[in-house]
């Protein structure tokens, strides 16, 4: 991919000690022995189970600011109540009824899209941060990586209220960073099947088994507000269990890719974010892998 033919996001090297606990997790200095140890742990966990967590990386005061922003913006969220398969594609009647591409579950959730965040948002600062980008690149062992060009889905808040459920699915991007902003009263647990597919093998049989209730290889993750999760969502199928109670589950989703030209396909963008923009149609056919989305 020749990245010189379009503009890349301009990153900022601002100090991030107003957002990150850099005393405990000195991710701003990757030569620091503590940072090196943290990167090594994350690399090992990502290799083994496709997921790593840095506990309490984001300071409580930053979490409070993002929580307040999400609550202010909740009326601008796109709320979906529809059905989708794990690939966010339309039904294909040419496939047999038992194929996972024909397995649809009802999803209820909302997204506060990236393009409606406040200019001074902590989440914008996180996504603009060269410090975080370098740390994430080191953890995933991939360089260079880039911020996602998708103007709606690059770093939204996901919001789930009482009764909401986000079914099994794969991500359309390479790497997702999740920061829990607010836990639900009950439920809202993250479940995933690590590395269940690869660019060489969609592994439809194993995917189908989990869709129909199988638990082999499924892991459950309990995040706390301020925790940062690194996740290979392109290859690990995942879901969020049903939320219960008055307190919304809110999570920030900064998203990164190896190919900066990619964006969501129009169908996925409409399902998740309520609309598709010209960029989604212009780049629809561009994919760096041959996977079903």
Q: Whereabouts are the PLM-identified features?
A:
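Short functional linear motifs
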Residues: 43, 63-64
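Catalytic core of non-heme Fe(II) oxygenases with the double-stranded beta-helix
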Residues: 117-124, 133-228
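Short amphipathic
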Residues: 52-58
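Catalytic core of Fe(II)/2-oxoglutarate
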Residues: 189-195, 199-293
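Long, compositionally biased
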Residues: 89, 93-97, 175
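Fe(II)/2-oxoglutarate
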Residues: 1-48, 276-293
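Short, solvent-exposed beta-strand-terminating loops
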Residues: 68, 72-90, 193
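Signature of the catalytic double-stranded beta-helix
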Residues: 58-59, 65-77, 97-150
